[in-house]
C-alpha cells in the first residue's frame, strides 16, 4: 500500500472511531456544535476537526476531533467558534489555545507510525 493509501486508511479508521466513541448504545451520535442527532454511520455524521486535517500534528489527535453533522462540518466550515467554546467547556479554559499552539508544530509521521495507529484504532473499534 502506498503512503497515500495508508493515510487514507488511517483517516477512515480514525473517523469511524471518533463517531462510534461518542455514539450511544443505539449508534446515535450528537453533533458537537449544533446538537443534531443522527446515526454514526453514513452521510449524517462526520469526524469534525477543530483545527483542520492539514495540521499533521492534530490530524489524528482525539482532543481535536468530535462528531459533527455534514452541515456544521462542511457548509458552516466546522463552526470553529462554537467548537472552541465547547472544547474549553469540556477540557478547561485554554484547550482551544493549546490545540492552536500544537497545530504550529512541525510533525512528520513515519509510515510505521501510521500503520501502528491503524492497528491501534482497529483494536479500539473491535472493543466497542
Q: In which residue ranges do the predicted regions lie?
A:
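Short flanking/linker segments adjacent to small metal-binding domains or redox-active Cys/His motifs
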Residues: 95-128
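Short, charged surface segments at domain edges that flank catalytic/cofactor-binding sites
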Residues: 1-30, 107-112
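Histidine-centered nuclease catalytic patch
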Residues: 30-64
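Conserved aromatic-histidine-acidic binding/catalytic patches
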Residues: 6, 57, 75
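Short microdomains enriched in Cys/His and/or Lys/Arg
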Residues: 51-65, 88-102
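Short Cys/His-centered divalent metal-binding micro-motifs
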Residues: 36, 65-92
Amino acid at each position: 500500500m502506498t503512503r497515500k493509501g495508508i493515510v487514507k486508511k488511517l483517516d477512515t479508521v480514525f473517523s469511524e472511531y471518533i463517531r462510534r466513541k461518542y455514539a450511544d448504545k443505539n449508534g446515535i451520535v450528537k453533533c458537537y456544535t449544533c446538537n443534531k442527532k443522527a446515526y454514526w454511520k453514513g452521510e449524517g455524521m462526520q469526524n469534525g476537526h477543530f483545527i483542520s486535517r492539514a495540521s499533521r500534528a492534530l490530524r489524528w489527535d482525539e482532543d481535536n476531533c468530535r462528531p459533527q453533522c455534514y452541515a456544521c462540518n462542511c457548509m458552516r466550515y466546522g463552526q470553529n467558534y462554537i467548537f472552541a467554546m465547547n472544547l474549553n467547556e469540556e477540557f478547561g479554559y485554554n484547550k482551544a489555545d493549546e490545540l492552536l499552539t500544537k497545530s504550529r508544530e512541525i510533525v512528520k509521521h513515519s509510515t510505521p507510525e501510521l500503520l501502528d495507529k491503524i492497528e491501534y484504532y482497529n483494536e479500539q473499534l473491535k472493543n466497542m
